[in-house]
Structure formats: structure tokens, C-alpha cells
Amino acid sequence: MLYAKAQSLERGLRERWGRLLHTAMLTLSASSTDDSGNPLPPIEHLEELLSSWEAVRRALSRVLDGREWEYLAILEPHESGYVHIHVGVFVKGPVVAEQFQPVIDAHLRNCDLAKREAHEIVDDDGEEDTVRVRRASHPSRQDGIQNLGAYLAAYMAGEYGKEATEMPEHVQRFYAVMWATGRQWFRPSNGAQ
């Protein structure tokens, strides 16, 4: 059900905004070890990662004030089983990666486990890193992510059709943390529901 909702999100926005639809994907993470290098309990890690969410959401609202936009945030496991967040942002009109620096800064200020070196807008080669911006491509074209909503949902869904016990071990650990905390894997903006 979520996959269908996420897949229809960008399609609906493309119908409303046409060629003005632009997308950005922000990645928010947190260190999975303490200052001594010891692994953190996965639930403690998740709670700290999510501690910045309200500040991130407010910063996103300020950055895009006066514009039409929606978001879809997805929790997804690393190979280690620890969680990171992908925030898909759908905007009417052009955006550039640097516009989202205040959003990344809000995460860094409010999540004690977030490290600046893991949240650079542009990497050492000058390529987009923590924030990737694209003009949404039309489904008939071969370049770009065809549907960012579906792309984000694919992170969450993992391998479709498999039972949870048949998923890779890191995905099973992720499922256990989600179940133990009662957390949803996705957070849509009001207009993206």
C-alpha cells in the first residue's frame, strides 16, 4: 500500500506542476558508535537520530517558505542494521543543493551523534553528496530518477515479495528495531498523504 502511495505522489505532483517539478533527496545519518568506538544499542541510536526531526522539518519549512512543496521521509537501514533517513523533497520550481544547508545544519545541531564530515552538501570532488537535486524527468526519458516517491519507497520495501525472515540480516535487525519502538518507516508531509 505504501509503495503505491509513494509511487503516485510524484506522478500527481508532475500533473499539477508539470515541468516546474524539481526534487531533492537529503540524507540524514548519525554515528552508530559512542566516543570510545563501542556500538550503540540500535534503539538508542534511532531515538538520537530522530531527535532532530522537528528542527529539520522547521528548517525545511523556512528554506521553502512561500513555495509549493511536499516531502516524504523514509527510514532505511545501513548494511550494519543501523538506521538513516532519506528525505525526498518535491518543489514547484528550481532548487539547488546549497539551499538545503540550513536543514542539514538543523540536523547537526540537534542530533548529538550526527557528524559534519558525513553531511557535506558537496564532496571533495565538487559533486552533490548529502543533498541531491534533480529536475524531475518525464517517464518517457531515460535519464534521472523517474519517480523519486517510488525510489524512496523501494528503500523501505527492500526485496518485494519476501517474507521478513527471508530478508537479509541487516533488514531483519531494522524490522526488529521498528517493531520494538513502534515507529513508522515513513513520514509524509500533510499534502503527500
Cite the ranges covered by each PLM segment.
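Short hydrophobic/aromatic beta-strand micro-patches
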Residues: 88-90
